[in-house]
Amino acid sequence: MQMNSVWKLSLGLLLLSSVIGSFAELDFGHCETLVKKWADSSSSREEHVNKDKRSLKDLLFFLHVPRTGGRTYFHCFLRKLYDSSEECPRSYDKLHFNPRKEKCKLLATHDDYSLMAKLPRERTSVMTIVRDPIARVLSTYEFSVEVAARFLVHPNLTSASRMSSRIRKSNVISTLDIWPWKYLVPWMREDLFARRDARKLKEVVIIEDDNPYDMEEMLMPLHKYLDAPTAHDIIHNGATFQIAGLTNNSHLSEAHEVRHCVQKFKSLGESVLQVAKRRLDSMLYVGLTEEHRESASLFANVVGSQVLSQVVPSNATAKIKALKSEASVTISETGSDKSNIQNGTSEVTLNKAEAKSGNMTVKTLMEVYEGCITHLRKSQGTRRVNSLKRITPANFTRGTRTRVPKEVIQQIKSLNNLDVELYKYAKVIFAKEHELVSNKLISSSKRSIVDLPSELKSVLGEMGEEKLWKFVPVALMLLLIVLFFLFVNAKRRRTSKVKI
């Protein structure tokens, strides 16, 4: 009798495991079909779009992946090239205008690629910047802490939340209005207040570790941040999902389910990765955060030159803005000391000194950019210092990133496996475009000597490009010396004739 009961129990467990297994198999099968259907649909929509990807279309869509340096590009490049009247209404969270009716030329947003479904594809060029996934994730963590720490000027979380919602200004974009910070900052803010309250209950708080990424008494440790559901949904593989159009801010109805399937079954991620790669291939410009100077130069020559060429100069209405290199940046600090204790968000307004000119060149654009980023970085540095002093001794610098344990770095790589591959692919695209532009510039420099005497052209033609550029200053100096002697000699002849 006992053996019969054991046999029945075993049979029941076997049937149960079989049912569970079949459900899991059905779940995978459903996900596989769903992801494949989405990938096929995405590919077919883009088959005949952007055949001439290197030509700037009527609308430039800057797909801004968070923490890649896109804010610098927007303020120090794009706002110098486009007049404010040419900017589309801000769409940091959702689309706030009808793109088929508006005649704007620049759309810069944290929206993902799904926004393209609402834009006139045949008249839209896309650009983006990609960053090393490890650096991007660390920067996301640091910025979440930095912005959330600004709220600690308030006595408690209720006060901070009430004040920030009350002071929202309609004409200024707040960090809490922007995806993904509208999710990440409140999450970190709540954690910082909870830890501060816990410290107040203790008579003495001893912080033994000076590693800001593992300072549990002050803030959420990095390894816990990485494992949280919010991080899995928004941060990990964030660049791939954003370029694929599958974030939790997507305009696609199926985005959540597709993303969930890929997160649950890693093998399905390859389909999403391939879609993201094809979209990078079709873009007008792909920059790299780590190759800052080269990326800026490439942007100026690929995008900037085309925007400049479309401008028709006129005395009163030229639209190219040769801004002074010291762009005036006004920052309303989040919870800054005394004078600016207003709310828990960072609000940035650029007061542009506009000197309209139709004579701006790629060279002057780069000069303006260099001056602008120097000022902008200084302002950002000041803001960070003021924020992080509220959670002293925690502080983030380039040097402190070396304190992150190797196993945590490996964890970031594993959780961002799609982004790792996408970044590798972006580097290949960047290298090809950089070489192409460099060759065009060399060809242009060769054409500039067409009008020289044939003997001199022959000599220069045999010289290498590097030697050629070294030769130019010397040649100019020799030419000036010859002209000087000719001038002196002519003067002497005139003097001799007068004496006779």
UniProtKB/Swiss-Prot annotation:
EC nos: 2.8.2.20
Domain of life: Eukaryota
InterPro entries reported for this sequence: Heparan_SO4-6-sulfoTrfase (IPR010635), P-loop_NTPase (IPR027417), Sulfotransferase (IPR005331)
Keywords of the record: Glycoprotein, Golgi apparatus, Membrane, Signal, Transferase, Transmembrane, Transmembrane helix
Active site (UniProt): 121, 142
Tissues expressing this chain: Expressed throughout the plant body, highest levels of expression are in the root apical meristem.
Ranges facing Cytoplasmic side: 489-500
Protein name per Swiss-Prot or TrEMBL: Protein-tyrosine sulfotransferase
Residues listed as glycosylation sites in the UniProt record: 156, 248, 315, 343, 359, 395
GO molecular function: protein-tyrosine sulfotransferase activity
Segment forming the signal sequence: 1-24
Function: Catalyzes the O-sulfation of tyrosine residues within acidic motifs of polypeptides.
Annotated membrane topology: Single-pass type I membrane protein
UniProt-listed GO biological process terms: copper ion homeostasis; innate immune response; negative regulation of ethylene biosynthetic process; regulation of gene expression; regulation of root meristem growth; response to auxin; stem cell population maintenance
TM stretches of this protein: 468-488
Locations listed in the record: Golgi apparatus membrane
Species whose genome carries this gene: Arabidopsis thaliana
Coiled-coil stretches noted in the UniProt entry, renumbered to this chain: none
Catalytic activity: L-tyrosyl-[protein] + 3'-phosphoadenylyl sulfate = O-sulfo-L-tyrosine-[protein] + adenosine 3',5'-bisphosphate + H(+)
The protein's enzyme class: transferase
A cellular component annotation (GO) from this entry: endosome
Positions in the Lumenal compartment: 25-467
